[in-house]
Amino acid sequence: EKVDPPDVPRDDHVDETRLHADDAEALLEYYRNNADDRVRYSRDHALLALAWYTGARLGGLRSLDIEDYNQDEEYIQFTHTPDQDTPLKNGRDGERIVGLPSHICDILDGYIANERHEVYDDYGREPLLASQLGRVSKNGLRAWMYLATVPCLHSDCPHGNERPTCDFVDYSEASKCPSSRSPHQVRTGSITWQLNRGVPPQVVADRVNTSVRVIKRHYDQPTKLEEMRERRQDHLDSLDFEDEGGDGE
């Protein structure tokens, strides 16, 4: 006998914590408009900009080399190289080329020219997102992202703290800030934002290396306000007495 699956609440399926588009925009504007080139072209800016505009996973971001960035054609290329400690989650199926907006390329150009550590990894490759010692570890990159997304960079602390005395602005403590975000949470926010901007689901899926089914189930998470706007756009015009046919009798 066929048994219908239980009606599981949406919150039980997914973790809806993400970097929201408004916060991403405020953070990126803080970096982009900063008068100090050390901030404008910082590693944190390059990391957040890449993560937001590509929707890439942590492993994909970590895998990038300088040669994977094509300045002239304005794209980044993800390559699966498991024998050199940079695998992609989906293996060869995860390999792809992702186009970048010109202003993101400007950031990467400035970062590479001014702030990137000129180092090699254990295999003689030049990691794009480099630490002082070479290719950053996964935990290290995760810590960088937490630090890059603390909200007091662009506005008053939403938790009542003062930046000069807040422990969360330290590299080792940023993950404890309730409003900082992990690479996965940035990816989730990016995918939702791309969909809300009208990019077709299949195009988003190709850019971020997942399926449309997975996007719909795990990443397409509009807020209540976004859901209202979608309902209004699709149906509000129908809720008008003046559009009804006949004389009303």
Question: What is the role of each PLM region?
Answer:
Residues 234-249:
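C-terminal secondary-structure termini that scaffold catalytic or DNA-interacting sites
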Residues 1-29:
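Flexible interdomain linker/hinge and immediately adjacent N-terminus
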Residues 143-206, 213, 221:
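Short, basic (Lys/Arg/His-rich) helix/loop patches that form interaction surfaces
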Residues 21, 25-58, 93, 123:
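Basic, Lys/Arg- and aromatic-enriched nucleic-acid-binding interface segment
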Residues 208-233:
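Catalytic-site neighborhood detector that most strongly recognizes the C-terminal catalytic loop/helix
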Residues 1-4, 57-59, 152:
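N-terminal DNA-binding recognition helix of tyrosine site-specific recombinases/integrases
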Residues 105-144, 156-166:
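Major-groove DNA-contacting interfaces characterized by cationic-aromatic clusters
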Residues 63-110, 117-119:
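Conserved tyrosine-mediated DNA breakage-rejoining catalytic core shared by Y-recombinases
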